[in-house]
Amino acid sequence: MKSMISGISSKIVESKKAKIFLLGTRILWIITTIIYIVLFYFITNKYVSLSEDDIDEYNIKGNEEELLKDDKIFNNYYKSYNKINAICGTFLILLCIVNIISSFYSKLNRGYMLYYKRMIGFVSLHLQLLFIAIMFLQNHENELFFCNINKYIYWFEDYDNKTDLFINSGENLCKVHNYSYIFPACFLFFSLIEFVVLYFKIEKHFRKKFLIFYIKMGTGIMYLALFYIFLKSKSFYNNILSEYNIFTLDDYSDPIKIIIFATQKQKMYYFQLLLVSTVSSAIVFCLLGYFDIYTIMKSCRFSLLVNIPISVFTMIVVFSQLLFSSYILETSAFFCAYEEFIEIHKRDQKASNKMIAPSNITETDWFCNLKSFDYIYFTNISTCLVIFGSDFIVSLYLVFSKKYAPKTS
């Protein structure tokens, strides 16, 4: 009797310690998020503001003091970064508060309310991954732009002798974005703690299935975050870069004209294909992830059985996507070799040494720098293929194994 009482009391103590640890982690997450939003708002704002020395050195007039902030291209990056940090950071804080309330609200531990408490945990984990992925990719997009600012000097030539201001600001912001990866990495670490807590609350025979759900949901979330980046990039390309990409081809040969016109069409196809692929994949994989959660929560054998043909069909679709992604990577490689390709044809046509359509070459360099997102897209597809293959094997085992037959209904 004494051993039973001591065993129960030790479990209560361990439970309290776990709650205190989780509470501390979530409070630390909230504090870290607030620091990230505020700190990087002021740092980025500092580097897009002109100092007194800059105003004197470059003879900046009163109406030009917001030169960097008012520039449409700079505005697209630094403002988007701060907005995303504020929006996603706020939601991360709210999710932490929801998790804190649900863990200490005793009524949620009774009967059917426990089911809803666990669902809150799953949905919260899903949304946390989404906001972290968007913040990470937004930071990466800004890093790609500001760290390659020297390639985009053509866009700032209208400012006469003030292009150095854009270069200096870009180089400083490049360093800022290199360091700011630390915070999304911390958020991901906190999210992994939430995952581990949920993982050990799942019945042992379903833990592998839950791990697969987590990775499957992660790939769906990454597709959704990539959709946001490609949609934003397409809007930037259509509404802002189109104003800068003005040139005439009257003095050039027909082969060069064909290359340039074909490349412009390719840019639109590139975005359209990626947008359709990412949003459709995100929806399908997230829905399949929630189907997995239903299976785990209900310990439903029939759902596991249904999941087997679904996994096979999804693997076929993902494999076709993998083949399609090779076309995307090939297109990206062409954008990166575009200037060299133009130069070869220019020499063949014995054209002048004057640079052909510099605005178009600068724009295509910008497309080339999107290749990092293409590699993330390709890696995500490869991960999906592996994870759905694993899901097929695990579901097959849980359905037909005699060991787990009594544990599923």
Swiss-Prot record:
How does it sit in the bilayer? Multi-pass membrane protein
GO cellular component annotations of the record: plasma membrane
Q: Which UniProt key words apply to this protein? A: Cell membrane, Glycoprotein, Membrane, Transmembrane, Transmembrane helix
Note the superkingdom of the native organism.
Eukaryota
Tell me which residues are glycosylated: 161, 178, 360, 380
Residue numbers on the Cytoplasmic membrane side: 1-19, 105-118, 201-209, 294-303, 402-409
Q: What is its main location?
A: membrane
Annotated localization: Cell membrane
Extracellular compartment spans:
41-83, 140-179, 231-272, 325-380
Give the phenotype of cells or organisms lacking this gene: Repeated attempts to generate a knockout failed. Conditional knockdown results in the arrest of parasite development at the trophozoite stage. Early arrest of gametocyte development.
Transmembrane stretches, by residue range? Answer: 20-40, 84-104, 119-139, 180-200, 210-230, 273-293, 304-324, 381-401
Functionally, this protein is described as follows: Orphan transporter. Required for parasite growth. Required for early gametocytogenesis.
Q: What protein name applies here?
A: Plasma membrane resident transporter 1
Q: Which organism is it from?
A: Plasmodium falciparum (isolate 3D7)
